[in-house]
């Protein structure tokens, strides 16, 4: 059940999300793959088939971590970064569309992510808060 502030992930909306992500990936050479997952962990869009299989597990880790953070701390946490020997994975919560953006790259810092999820919301024509 979506709250009044959440938008349903329709095929049209998912296609627009994919278009935005592909555009910014084209300008960020360090980003190798990206996916959008619903809060139930289901992958609704992925930049490639291999990441489509991996992203739901990564998203679930992020979702569980965000829930744990909310339970034990005050304040807001909207993203998590996982660093491995081969690169980094960023997990970004996108509340208005009840989703998690999962991005894999070679650098621990992916500069286009600094503007996410605000850039994604602007691309969808949605208001950006804060």
Where are these regions (language model features)?
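Non-catalytic interaction/Regulatory regions outside core domains
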Residues: 1-39, 43-130
């Amino acid at each position: 059940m979506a709250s009044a502030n959440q938008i349903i992930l329709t095929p049209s909306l998912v296609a627009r999300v994919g278009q935005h992500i592909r555009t910014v990936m084209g300008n960020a050479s360090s980003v190798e793959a990206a996916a959008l997952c619903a809060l139930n962990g289901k992958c609704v869009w992925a930049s490639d088939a291999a990441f489509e299989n991996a992203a739901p597990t990564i998203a679930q880790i992020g979702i569980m971590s965000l829930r744990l953070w909310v339970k034990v701390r005050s304040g807001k946490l909207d993203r998590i970064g996982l660093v491995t020997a081969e690169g980094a994975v960023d997990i970004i919560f996108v509340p208005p569309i009840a989703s998690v953006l999962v991005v894999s790259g070679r650098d621990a810092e992916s500069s286009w992510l600094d503007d996410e999820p605000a850039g994604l919301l602007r691309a969808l024509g949605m208001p950006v808060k804060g």
